[in-house]
Amino acid sequence: MKLRVDLQFFAGEKTEKATPKKRKDTRKKGQVAKSSDVNTAVSLLVIFLSLIAIGPYMRDRLLSFIETFYTESLTMKLSESNVHTLFVSLLKDMGMILAPILLVALVAGVVSNYMQVGFLFSAEVIQPKLEKLDPIKGFKRIYSMRAIVELIKSILKIVVVGFAAFAVLWLHYGEILRLPLLTPEEALSFVSKLTLWMGLSGAGALLILAGLDYLYQRFDYEKNIKMSKQDIKDEYKKSEGDPIIKSKIKQRQREMAMRRMMQEVPKADVIITNPTHYAIALKYDEEKMDAPYIVAKGVDHLALKIRKIAKEHDVMMVENRPLARALYDQVEIDQAVPEEFFKVLAEILAYVYKTKQKVY
């Protein structure tokens, strides 16, 4: 009993790496290997690091705002203009306090995104799609492998960040217990530093998870854009044309070129032969041409065909083995013969013209 295996079954399996065209097309659709956790982690880390530098500025601005609010704003007469002035002043002060952090977060987010995918804008991502409203597909997305991975990632982030924060608190356990004994300024300074260390620890832990997530996203992306052998064949046909059709076109072009070449053989003045392997058809008109040029050439069966046509049309054939081989190798069809061959060709053409005069 013979077991027959249909190889077409395996042709549909996506086992091949994506072609450059497939990668380009998916990129245009906004499908790239990217982890949003990297943007979040980098932004948080840069924000907390920048607080080391701009923290004193923010503290001074905040204390100045509080002082002004309690010394001046609370004593102002309640009126529409004063409320408006107070509201504008509040927005201005809050903007001055938060602007550096917001700017740092924006720059960090843009840079981290650029490092992952480069410059990319795809309108297709923001286009509304009715398939997203399909409850069946929505249900499948909820219980898909990607959803499970996202759930695991969320749990890991909570656990890791929680552990990092707990570790910082545990390391400063004694100092936390002494907080009631500190002055307000000392307590504020300690809490600020503690918050900063917790933020840096949490952001660092998130960055490690984000790096792992990026590797997973890249692996998942490569898996999703894999192609089957049939996909690659179809893509090649669309971009380059069907190989069978292209080969037929090339064959037709060769046949047409061959036909045109053979039509020029009767017009030749002489055929230089090897005598059996090479045949070179030359034409020369001293009134129109500076040098003889080749109208046809060939080897073996093609040389035989050229000699046959030449014989049918009484075109003289001259045997010169080295010249025939040299002309075949160095000169193309419809190309003038180089100067180095002028002397020997002049002798051959003179012999041909002299022979024709005797005949006629």
Curated annotation (Swiss-Prot):
Chief location? membrane
- Note the InterPro entries from the entry: FlhB, T3SS_substrate_exporter, T3SS_substrate_exporter_C
Q: Which UniProt keywords apply?
A: Bacterial flagellum biogenesis, Bacterial flagellum protein export, Cell membrane, Membrane, Protein transport, Transmembrane, Transmembrane helix, Transport
* Annotated compartments: Cell membrane
For this chain's UniProt record, which GO biological process terms are given? bacterial-type flagellum assembly; bacterial-type flagellum-dependent swarming motility; protein secretion
Membrane topology field: Multi-pass membrane protein
Q: What family is this?
A: Belongs to the type III secretion exporter family.
Chain's role: May be involved in the export of flagellum proteins.
For this entry, the protein name equals: Flagellar biosynthetic protein FlhB
Q: What is the lineage of its organism?
A: Bacteria, Bacillati, Bacillota, Bacilli, Bacillales
Write the gene name.
flhB
